[in-house]
């Protein structure tokens, strides 16, 4: 055997080994890609109180195990605390807005409620139940409630205060709707994974308040879809953190930032224009043109208002090739979210298959 033939033989052995290693690497990459395809990361973004946490609760109801009686019982204290927080906010606003109580005895009731340390509330009993009922029935407090855009008040206030007898019952167990309406500011990051058609959807909810946003940064890797929530009803409200800044302007600024982040170049963007039910109520007495002078549509027209708001957000997209998928939602309405998320899921799966060249 000549030296050349021995070398050729060795080379072919080396080449074979190199090819084998290369094939193994290719196979592993394909496996990794396939496994990554099985888990889709959905990042829920939006300013504070846009409805992100409610959306996650709906995923648990629609695609998870829901809320057992034991789970619901865990929300009882939070419902009580929400009621006290709301009434305290209105009592304080009565002073700020200089609205008098119609009934003299409600001044004492207001003082009683004002002195409660909400963090320590774990029951809902008299004299507090009667005090809060009496206050809620006072025309002064009702006027204060009607002027709620001038201070910070939870969207669920009316829902709970109109149902005090049920909540004050000693055998009270929160309903699914009570659970959906409870307001607890999200601090930190909440993940909710659920399985659909053998794909894991990992939904990530990050705090919306400004102080929470700096914690988002490490969530940004491998995001399949950005789901951005906007509260339609916030067009006439100011921020919790800054009372001279319009909430919708803040939401627009955040959306603009998010869609231009290089991290999200390959992520699909789904825009949820949420709280459509509250917009329908509010548009009857609070005119969009007073806050967005460029609006030239009809007054008291929820359809025209929401189309205008949608266009404001879509126009922030600088990339004409990037489609923004949009849906009008009411996050506290399970059937609405079931319907909307079915469409969103199909969109995400289709886009994901396209990315992996499977369609």
Curated annotation (Swiss-Prot):
Organism encoding this protein: Rattus norvegicus (Rat)
Sample GO molecular function, one term: enzyme regulator activity
Gene3D superfamilies (UniProt xref): GI Alpha 1, domain 2-like, P-loop containing nucleotide triphosphate hydrolases
Region: G5 motif, residue numbers: 329-334
S-palmitoyl cysteine lipid sites: 9-10
Binding, Mg(2+): 53, 186
Region (G1 motif): 41-54
Predominant cellular place of this UniProt entry's protein: membrane
Membrane topology: Lipid-anchor
Subunit structure: G proteins are composed of 3 units; alpha, beta and gamma. The alpha chain contains the guanine nucleotide binding site. Interacts (GDP-bound form) with RIC8A (via C-terminus); promoting GNAQ folding and association with the plasma membrane. Binds NHERF1. Forms a complex with PECAM1 and BDKRB2. Interacts with GAS2L2.
Record-listed 5-glutamyl histamine modification sites: 209
EC number: 3.6.5.-
Pfam families xrefs: G-alpha
Catalytic activity: GTP + H2O = GDP + phosphate + H(+)
Protein name listed in UniProt: Guanine nucleotide-binding protein G(q) subunit alpha
Region (G3 motif): 201-210
Localisation: Cell membrane; Golgi apparatus; Nucleus; Nucleus membrane
Residues that hold GTP according to the record: 50-54, 156, 180-181, 183, 274-275, 277, 331
Keyword match Acetylation: no
G-alpha domain residues: 38-359
Lineage, broadest ranks: Eukaryota, Metazoa, Chordata, Craniata, Vertebrata
Keyword terms: Cell membrane, Golgi apparatus, GTP-binding, Hydrolase, Lipoprotein, Magnesium, Membrane, Metal-binding, Nucleotide-binding, Nucleus, Palmitate, Transducer
Similarity field: Belongs to the G-alpha family. G(q) subfamily.
G4 motif: annotated segments: 270-277
Single GO biological process annotation from the record: positive regulation of insulin secretion
Region listing for G2 motif, in residue ranges: 178-186
């Amino acid at each position: 055997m000549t030296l050349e033939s021995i070398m050729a033989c060795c080379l072919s052995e080396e080449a074979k080994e190199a090819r084998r290693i290369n094939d193994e690497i290719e196979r592993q990459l394909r496996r990794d890609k396939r496994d990554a395809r099985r888990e889709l990361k959905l990042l829920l973004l939006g300013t504070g109180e846009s409805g992100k946490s409610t959306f996650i609760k709906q995923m648990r109801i629609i695609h998870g195990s829901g809320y057992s009686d034991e789970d619901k019982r865990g929300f009882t204290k939070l419902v009580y605390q929400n009621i006290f927080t709301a009434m305290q906010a209105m009592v304080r606003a009565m002073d700020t807005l200089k609205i008098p109580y119609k009934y003299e005895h409600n001044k004492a009731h207001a003082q009683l409620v004002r002195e409660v340390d909400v963090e320590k509330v774990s029951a809902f009993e008299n004299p507090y139940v009667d005090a809060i009922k009496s206050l809620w029935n006072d025309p002064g407090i009702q006027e204060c409630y009607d002027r709620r855009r001038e201070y910070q008040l939870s969207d669920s206030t009316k829902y709970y205060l109109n149902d005090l007898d049920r909540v004050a019952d000693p055998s009270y167990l929160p309903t699914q709707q009570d659970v959906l309406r409870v307001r607890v500011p999200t601090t930190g990051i909440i993940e909710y994974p659920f399985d659909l058609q053998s794909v894991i959807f990992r939904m990530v909810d990050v705090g919306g308040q400004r102080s929470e946003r700096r914690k988002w940064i490490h969530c940004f890797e491998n995001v399949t879809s950005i789901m951005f929530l906007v509260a339609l009803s916030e067009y006439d409200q100011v921020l919790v953190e800054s009372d001279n800044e319009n909430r919708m302007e803040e939401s627009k600024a955040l959306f603009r930032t998010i869609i231009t982040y290089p991290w999200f170049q390959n992520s699909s963007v789904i825009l949820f224009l949420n709280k459509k039910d509250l917009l329908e109520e509010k548009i009857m007495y609070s005119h969009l043109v007073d806050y967005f002078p460029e609006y030239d549509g009809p007054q008291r027209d929820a359809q025209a208002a929401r189309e205008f708001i949608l266009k404001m957000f879509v126009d922030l997209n600088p990339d004409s090739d990037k489609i923004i998928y949009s849906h009008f939602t009411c996050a506290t309405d399970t059937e609405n979210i079931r319907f909307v998320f079915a469409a969103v899921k199909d969109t995400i799966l289709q886009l994901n298959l396209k990315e992996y060249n499977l369609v």
